[in-house]
């Protein structure tokens, strides 16, 4: 057997820093531990976040708009901190050791959160049937724990999906096909954890207590850590390629230094290493593209370039691959930006959907009440249904028409999800119109809950789940696949920032809408008593923004050109 058949060709190594053996490492034998880790970690995250808006209202005595904004601000931070973890992973530690470091911050935050909800003196006091009146210290401890978790997840989230994809050699056609399937099952694992969180854990929080409700997710996070480390001997590790930000700035500086230099018509004259390997550790060479030609100046050799002992000064002369890294990041940005509005729609599940459900009849039978936050289980059920259906049925069917091995291109897949999200917001808006009509007809303005079943919310949750399978999984695969090899954690983090900015956009929209609609003594669209508001207008506003966003996405996606990599990594 030839050496190339024994070892991977993508530059990966095993835990002992030896070339990765195909038979002993990677593939599904490694991914089972990664999927187990992700399932338990997401159970912990959603077990804490799904019902957070109700904790803020009932235990920290916050109003609807304040609680919703605090949830979206925290959730947004959870998707901004991955930029920190991604930079550390790509530049210094690699994905494995970054995850291994940040899990301890995560567990510490979860532990403190549990203590803040269960230990006398730390948990909110002065409680009556509906709410508590915490002091400033108790509130501070809670938010410190919450943002420790945000930092911990920031080191894990951008790395774990890319780390799983690293277990498949892109230079092996069989493994390359399996990698595409991995992203579907990765998202499936996320939603298995989310399903347990939305049912069992929310019920515990609402019926047993918040101490147990946060304690169980903490135990789940400890189990996630065990899953991760148990698989260490099977993992393939990509070596860090040095600071990606440094390489980006080197191209920019070199290009501006040669601002008056003309780029040759023959692009083969641009500087590139002579052998098959890229000069960037852990990265394959990238084929030159004709877009963003200004940056090609950084790869034009001139007499002013200083070369010592065969080494090029990278602040004066950059390889074509290094230039194409920057181009790849820039061309990803328009696609990235269109994900922000979708994330805003998605964030409504943990805020406005829950608040809407709080006003409806939550009885399931005579003696059981389902917490409004538990309705998100139908989003999860939708994801768990559509993920294998997409992987096993839709892709093979689509291949017959598109002749694409993936069924749809990644951009087509994401676009389908954007369309579905528009209908999700329209559905939520129509339900709110019907609910408000019931309130008006029965003069139920001051009733805490009206006689209208919460299960009328199911369609909007199912549509959000369907949209996730197309857009979020498409984003995971797209940003990994189109990222330069040595910037994959960074690009995965970049895709996650759409969720952060989507949450922040939701906060801004709620704040602006309330400021405008509360004028002249009116209660506004989203008052504490939703029976006197117009939440339907807010949902229709999001539907309109989503439609406009989709039109922009169509224009961008038609002009996008997929990257091409050649050679092998060293």
From Swiss-Prot:
UniProt-listed GO biological process terms: dipeptide transport; protein transport; tripeptide transport
Membrane topology field: Multi-pass membrane protein
Phenotype reported upon loss of the gene: Reduced growth and lower N content when cultivated on dipeptides. No effect on germination.
InterPro entries in UniProt: MFS_trans_sf, POT_fam, PTR2_symporter_CS
Molecular function via GO: dipeptide transmembrane transporter activity; tripeptide transmembrane transporter activity
Tissue specificity note: Expressed in cotyledons, hypocotyls, leaves, roots, flowers, pistils and vascular tissue of sepals, anthers, carpels and funiculi. Not detected in seeds.
SUPFAM superfamilies: MFS general substrate transporter
Keywords: Cell membrane, Membrane, Peptide transport, Phosphoprotein, Protein transport, Transmembrane, Transmembrane helix, Transport
Chief subcellular location: membrane
Coiled coil (UniProt feature): none
Subcellular location(s) of the protein: Cell membrane
Record flagged with keyword Zinc-finger: no
Transmembrane segments: 99-119, 140-160, 182-202, 210-230, 329-349, 377-397, 414-434, 454-474, 494-514, 537-557
GO cellular component: plasma membrane; plasmodesma
Modified-residue entries (Phosphothreonine), positions: 98
Pfam families: PTR2
Record keyword Lipid biosynthesis present: no
Protein family: Belongs to the major facilitator superfamily. Proton-dependent oligopeptide transporter (POT/PTR) (TC 2.A.17) family.
Function: Peptide transporter. Mediates the transport of di- and tripeptides. High affinity transporter with low selectivity. No transport of amino acids.
Protein name, entry field: Protein NRT1/ PTR FAMILY 8.1
Organism: Arabidopsis thaliana (Mouse-ear cress)
């Amino acid at each position: 057997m030839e050496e190339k058949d024994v070892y991977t060709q993508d530059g990966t190594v095993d835990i002992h820093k030896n070339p990765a053996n195909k038979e002993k490492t990677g593939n599904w034998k490694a991914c089972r531990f990664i999927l187990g880790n992700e399932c338990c970690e997401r159970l912990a995250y959603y077990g804490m976040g799904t019902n957070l808006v109700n904790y803020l209202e009932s235990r920290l005595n916050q109003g609807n708009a304040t609680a919703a904004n605090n949830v979206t601000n925290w959730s947004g931070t959870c998707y901004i901190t991955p930029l920190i973890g991604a930079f550390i992973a790509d530049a210094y530690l690699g994905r494995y050791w970054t995850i291994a470091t940040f899990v301890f911050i995560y567990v510490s935050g979860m532990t403190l959160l549990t203590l803040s909800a269960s230990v006398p003196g730390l948990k909110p006091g002065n409680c009556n049937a509906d709410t508590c009146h915490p002091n400033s210290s108790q509130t501070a401890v809670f938010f410190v724990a919450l943002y420790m978790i945000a930092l911990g997840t920031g080191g894990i989230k951008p790395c774990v999906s890319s780390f799983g994809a690293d277990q498949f050699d892109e230079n092996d056609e069989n493994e390359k096909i399996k990698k595409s399937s991995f992203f579907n099952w990765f998202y499936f694992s996320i939603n298995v954890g989310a399903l347990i969180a939305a049912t069992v854990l929310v019920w515990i929080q609402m019926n047993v207590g918040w101490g147990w409700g946060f304690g169980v997710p903490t135990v789940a996070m400890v189990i996630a850590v065990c899953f991760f480390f148990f698989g260490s001997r099977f993992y393939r590790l990509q070596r860090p390629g040095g600071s990606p930000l440094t390489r980006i700035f080197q191209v920019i500086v070199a290009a501006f230094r040669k601002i008056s230099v003309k780029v040759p018509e023959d692009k083969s004259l641009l500087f590139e290493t002579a052998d098959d390997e890229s000069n960037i550790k852990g990265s394959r060479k990238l084929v030159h593209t004709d877009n963003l030609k200004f940056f090609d100046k950084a790869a034009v050799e001139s007499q002013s370039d200083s070369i010592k002992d065969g080494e090029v000064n990278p602040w004066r002369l950059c390889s074509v691959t290094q230039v194409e890294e920057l181009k790849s990041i820039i061309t990803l940005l328009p696609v990235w930006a269109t994900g922000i509005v979708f994330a805003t729609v998605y964030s409504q599940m943990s805020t406005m959907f829950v608040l809407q459900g709080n006003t409806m009849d939550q009885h399931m039978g005579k003696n059981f009440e389902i917490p409004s936050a538990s309705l998100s289980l139908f989003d999860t059920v939708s994801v768990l249904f559509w993920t294998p259906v997409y992987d096993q049925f839709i892709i093979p069917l689509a291949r017959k028409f598109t002749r694409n091995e993936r069924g749809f291109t990644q951009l087509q897949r994401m676009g389908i999800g954007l369309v579905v999200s528009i209908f999700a917001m329209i559905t939520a808006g129509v339900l709110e119109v019907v609910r408000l009509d019931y309130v008006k007809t029965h003069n139920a303005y001051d009733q805490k809950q009206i006689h209208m079943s919460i299960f009328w919310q199911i369609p909007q949750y199912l549509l959000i789940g369907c949209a996730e399978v197309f857009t979020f999984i498409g984003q995971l695969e797209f940003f990994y696949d189109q990222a330069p090899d040595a910037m994959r954690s960074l690009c995965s983090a970049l895709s996650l920032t759409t969720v952060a900015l989507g949450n922040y956009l939701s906060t801004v929209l709620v704040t602006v809408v309330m400021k405008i609609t509360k004028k002249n003594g009116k209660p506004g669209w989203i008052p504490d008593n939703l029976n006197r508001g117009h939440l339907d207008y807010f949902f229709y506003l999001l539907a309109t923004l989503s439609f406009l966003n989709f039109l922009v996405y169509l224009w961008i996606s038609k002009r996008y050109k997929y990257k091409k990599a050649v050679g092998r990594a060293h």
